[in-house]
């Protein structure tokens, strides 16, 4: 639903809280949904994506100014259907109680049982971002619905056409007691994050996440925060530079680098920096013979983000960096209908440059040389823990050393970003890059309450062990057996 306009944050909160209370009441009234009901919810989501593919591509293109339908279908549509299908296929197995051994084990021999029962939390709030506005709404819902929850969604105000479309889509397939969408600006988001959800998922900037977490803390709402950071690429001396550059630049130019997992900077052996630059230029020329009117090359979403990314380049240039714009056709991009920034390499970057201090979130890639791989590891560890780390090479011992000595949300070896597509792996950050994880079974677990259930023996053995007053020799023997090394 649309959040009413011209309302205070408190008024917005009251409107949304009414829906929240109705969803919670419906959850209690209906009880935990069956596997069939959960599959029905997932199927409705899949049907929405399949049936609105063209409309989604049109809306996203309108919001970005230029993004090809193929890019949107790949990342936002197909990228959402995959997780939903995976959850649909496996949720019946996931829902089964998890059997555990009893403590002490002898209790189990006589019939006692210890299990974990997976219980829906209730109502989950989802705050989705602008960079993949459809995928980062539907992908969390795969776990939310598999776990048997209802959902309230606040899509980004920076992609208004897509947000309005999402609102209309969900209204066609779900009633408000199942899913409700609220569209609006920061005041709506502020009110939304302060609701007493049973769980809240936020995907976006670390700076905003602090406000979201603070608001959620007022109601002790557990949160999953999917944030970002400066995800490094470490190129080993054994890396194939042509392959590495092609894969890094593919990840860096996808959605014009507006991806939380985009490679943020490259650490390369000093003697290989120029080879990487040459191969990066060749790869971009293959991918994008032209940029200005090429729909395959995505625009930056808004003027303030365009100015921010251009500001990083200007700051680096002013502080002595070598700046290489990869513009295969030599087009004049100073006057253009859309906000396109060509892939840009920043060589000889220093830590006083903004491009090395802040997440870039655009098609700009600093390349920094190193003498030893330990130097590269130390550089990564001297900064905030990133959402992802990428290593390219053939030396298994070096790979293991890098992965053991660095901490990141996830890792892809010999490519970038692809670990996010693995539904059998958790996706999440650590530290400033986020907390919690979802995707596949991990999403089911994240959005479920793990209820511990112990079923005692029918026969009362406590008196036999002397565990009840008045205490005597029986309990002393029992304790003597327990309190020892």
Swiss-Prot record:
Identify the CDD domains for this entry: ALDH_CALDH_CalB (cd07133)
Any one cellular-component term (Gene Ontology): cytoplasm
Q: What is the catalytic activity of this protein? A: (E)-coniferaldehyde + NADP(+) + H2O = (E)-ferulate + NADPH + 2 H(+); (E)-coniferaldehyde + NAD(+) + H2O = (E)-ferulate + NADH + 2 H(+)
Q: Which SUPFAM superfamilies match?
A: ALDH-like
KW Calcium (keyword) present: no
The record's Gene3D superfamilies line, in alphabetical order, gives: Aldehyde Dehydrogenase, Chain A, domain 1 (3.40.605.10), Aldehyde Dehydrogenase, Chain A, domain 2 (3.40.309.10)
Q: Which residues form the active site?
A: 226, 260
GO MF, one term, reads:
coniferyl-aldehyde dehydrogenase [NAD(P)+] activity
Keyword entries, A-Z: NAD, Oxidoreductase
This entry's Enzyme Commission designation comes to 1.2.1.68
Please report the name of this protein according to its UniProt entry.
Probable coniferyl aldehyde dehydrogenase
List the lineage, top down. Answer: Bacteria, Pseudomonadati, Pseudomonadota, Alphaproteobacteria, Caulobacterales
């Amino acid at each position: 639903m649309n959040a009413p306009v011209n309302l205070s944050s408190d008024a917005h909160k009251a409107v949304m809280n009414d829906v929240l209370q109705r969803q919670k009441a419906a959850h209690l009234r209906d009880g935990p949904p069956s596997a069939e009901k959960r599959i029905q919810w997932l199927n409705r989501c899949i049907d929405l994506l399949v049936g609105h593919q063209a409309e989604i591509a049109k809306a996203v293109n309108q919001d970005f100014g230029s993004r090809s339908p193929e890019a949107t279908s790949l990342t936002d549509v197909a990228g959402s259907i995959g997780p939903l299908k995976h959850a649909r296929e496996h949720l019946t197995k996931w829902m089964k109680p998890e059997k555990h051994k009893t403590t002490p084990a002898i209790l189990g021999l006589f019939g006692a049982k210890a299990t974990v029962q997976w219980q829906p939390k209730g109502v989950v709030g989802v705050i989705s971002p602008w960079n993949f506005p459809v995928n980062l709404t539907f992908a969390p819902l795969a776990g939310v619905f598999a776990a048997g929850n209802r959902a309230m969604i606040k899509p980004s105000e920076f992609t208004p056409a897509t947000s309005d479309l999402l609102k209309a889509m969900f209204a066609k397939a779900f009633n408000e007691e199942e899913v409700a969408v609220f569209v609006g600006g920061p005041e709506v988001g502020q009110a939304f994050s302060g609701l007493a959800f049973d769980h809240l998922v936020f995907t976006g900037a670390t700076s905003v996440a602090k406000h979201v977490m603070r608001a959620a803390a007022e109601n002790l709402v557990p949160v999953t925060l999917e944030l970002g950071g400066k995800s490094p690429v470490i190129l080993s001396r054994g890396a194939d530079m042509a392959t590495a550059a092609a894969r890094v630049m593919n990840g860096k130019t996808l959605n014009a680098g507006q991806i939380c997992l985009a490679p943020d900077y490259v650490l390369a052996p000093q003697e290989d920096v120029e080879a990487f630059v040459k191969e990066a230029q060749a790869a971009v020329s293959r991918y994008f013979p032209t940029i200005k009117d090429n729909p395959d090359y995505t625009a930056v979403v808004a003027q303030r983000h365009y100015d921010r990314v251009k500001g990083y380049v200007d700051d680096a240039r002013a502080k002595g960096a070598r700046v290489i714009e990869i513009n295969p056709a030599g087009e004049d991009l100073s006057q253009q209908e859309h906000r396109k920034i060509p892939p840009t390499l920043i060589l000889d970057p220093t830590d006083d440059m903004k491009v090395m201090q802040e997440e870039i979130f655009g098609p700009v890639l600093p390349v920094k040389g190193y003498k030893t791989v330990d130097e590269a590891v130390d550089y990564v560890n001297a900064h905030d823990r990133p959402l992802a780390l990428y290593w390219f090479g053939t030396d298994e011992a070096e790979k293991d050393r890098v992965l053991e000595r660095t901490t990141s949300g996830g890792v892809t070896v010999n490519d970038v970003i692809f670990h996010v597509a693995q539904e059998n792996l958790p996706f999440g950050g650590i530290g400033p890059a986020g907390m919690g994880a979802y995707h596949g079974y991990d999403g089911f677990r994240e959005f479920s309450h793990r209820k511990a259930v112990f079923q005692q023996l029918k026969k009362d053995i406590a008196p036999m062990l002397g565990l009840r007053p008045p205490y005597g020799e029986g309990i002393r023997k029992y304790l003597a057996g327990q309190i020892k090394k």
